[in-house]
């Protein structure tokens, strides 16, 4: 990455054409931005954009779509770079992203009086787009389930957004550390801990659900709990680092993630949540 700066431009372009391009493209952007000088990085972005335009011409993909994809991937990644440079701590940055997510959730419910109706309208628009694109069956299935989906949309969108950008930052910092052979800069993902404050906040908001049946409180409880899946994953990485679990165990976790998404994330969240209370790492060390 450092010896051949043009390799960075190639990486930026190619990762936007891969599956999960927002994650791999964003992580590559974070790593290169941290590694390169500002001038070299701007050159890499320019070359990558030129390369994407040429690729679009060759394989008959809309250049506008490729450039919009680049903007939608790189702009949030740039904000993550600014955040990590300010905090100088990966753990604190991920915690701040969680705080921003909670604040956004509260702001959303303050601004939108009836979130379910809001998401109903959004999903109906999506259904219309699917119909226009010839995906009639998918549009029909969406329309039939629209009420149930709309009730879950707020928590799903916010939790997924936080998860995606946290993973982008973690992966980008990991690539950067490898490129400079410094495993300690910005701290280690294996040390991620949201602490007892968030654990208590999750418990209190969950208990209040038995007294107050309000949507924002329900979403807040689920959102706070969902943060802990990443702490559960970091604990697995710590166990692997300490050679308590084999590499195959960690690999299987990632392999199963797309197939048992909700179940596995819930299990990881339970591990992470209990870790916040009992600090498994210290107990195992002792």
What are these regions (language model features)?
Residues 16-24, 36-38, 59-64, 211-214, ...:
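Transmembrane helix interruption/hinge and helix-loop junction motifs
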Residues 178-232:
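Small-residue-rich helix-loop
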Residues 156-180:
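Transmembrane alpha-helical segments in integral membrane proteins
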Residues 106-153:
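Membrane-interface interhelical loops and short interface/amphipathic helices
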Residues 56-59, 67-111:
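Short helix-perturbing small/polar motifs within transmembrane alpha-helices
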Residues 214-215, 221-286:
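Long, positively charged, glycine-interspersed low-complexity recognition regions
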Residues 22-81, 271-275:
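Alpha-helical membrane segments and adjacent membrane-interface helices in multi-pass membrane proteins
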Residues 1-43, 246-254:
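Hydrophobic transmembrane alpha-helices
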């Amino acid at each position: 990455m450092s010896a051949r700066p043009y390799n960075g431009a190639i990486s930026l372009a190619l990762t936007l054409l891969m599956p999960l391009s927002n994650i791999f493209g964003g992580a590559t952007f974070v790593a290169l931005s941290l590694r390169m000088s500002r001038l070299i990085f701007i050159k890499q972005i320019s070359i990558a954009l030129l390369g994407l335009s040429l690729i679009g011409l060759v394989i008959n993909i809309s250049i506008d779509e490729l450039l919009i994809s680049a903007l939608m991937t790189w702009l949030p990644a740039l904000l993550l770079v600014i955040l990590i440079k300010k905090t100088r701590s990966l753990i604190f940055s991920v915690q701040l992203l969680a705080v921003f997510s909670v604040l956004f959730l509260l702001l959303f419910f303050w601004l939108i009086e009836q979130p379910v109706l809001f998401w109903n309208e959004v999903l109906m628009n999506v259904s219309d787009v699917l119909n226009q694109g010839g995906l009639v069956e998918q549009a029909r299935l969406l329309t039939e389930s629209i009420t149930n989906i709309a009730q879950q949309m707020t928590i799903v969108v916010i939790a997924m957004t936080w998860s995606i950008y946290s993973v982008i930052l973690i992966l980008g910092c990991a690539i950067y550390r490898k490129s400079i052979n410094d495993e300690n800069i910005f701290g280690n993902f294996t040390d991620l801990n949201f602490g007892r404050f968030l654990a208590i906040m999750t418990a209190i908001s969950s208990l209040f659900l038995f007294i107050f049946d309000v949507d924002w409180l329900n979403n807040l409880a689920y959102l706070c709990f969902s943060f802990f899946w990443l702490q559960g994953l970091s604990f697995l990485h710590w166990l692997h680092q300490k050679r308590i679990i084999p590499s195959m165990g960690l690999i299987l976790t990632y392999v199963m993630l797309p197939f048992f998404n909700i179940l596995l994330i819930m299990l990881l969240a339970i591990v992470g949540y209990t870790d916040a209370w009992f600090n498994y790492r210290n107990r195992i060390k002792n």
